[in-house]
Amino acid sequence: MPVIRTREDLRAYLAADLTAYGLRRWRLHHRILKRPAHFQRLLRKSEYWANTARTPAGHVVAAYLKLRTKFLGERLGFDIPRNVFGPGLSIAHTGLIVVHYKARVGTNCRIHHGVTIGEGRPGHFPTIGDDVFISPMAMVLGADVGNRVAIRPGAVVTKSVPDDVDVAGYPARIVKDRRPRAARGED
């Protein structure tokens, strides 16, 4: 999973995040009106400084941004650690979102309130692919989730999910399969 290592990476992540929110550029009033987007902006800057700090001043900036991100996250109900999400993250609403620090999520993930991405069995951490939509109150616990997957409201994902499907229920089952017939094993 790529992380932010250069200023170009930071710009690319911030641009992808803005695009995911449907914004063309960052404006000051988004700090107030788009609180999740503001949180993400701080998170991305915190990731950059944590990954690149080499001087004492850089470590101070990294610590300051980590604290700001933590306090804003607590106000919004987010517990999202650094270096988990790829570019293009979109947090739909404020509300409780908990993500394990060893989870890995690909590009263009849309996440709603009440979502938990955490450890399943001891030592099993989720890996989520690209272009994934996670609906409200869904849980992904130690499972691998493919690309272009929609996790419907209230689903509890504990087993691997293939690409191009929708899952729902407790435990999560495939409710819609968008894969070609050959990929499904049908003739």
Model-identified regions with their sequence ranges:
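Left-handed beta-helix
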Residues: 87-88, 92-101, 106-107, 111-113, ...
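Short linear elements at protein peripheries
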Residues: 56-104, 108
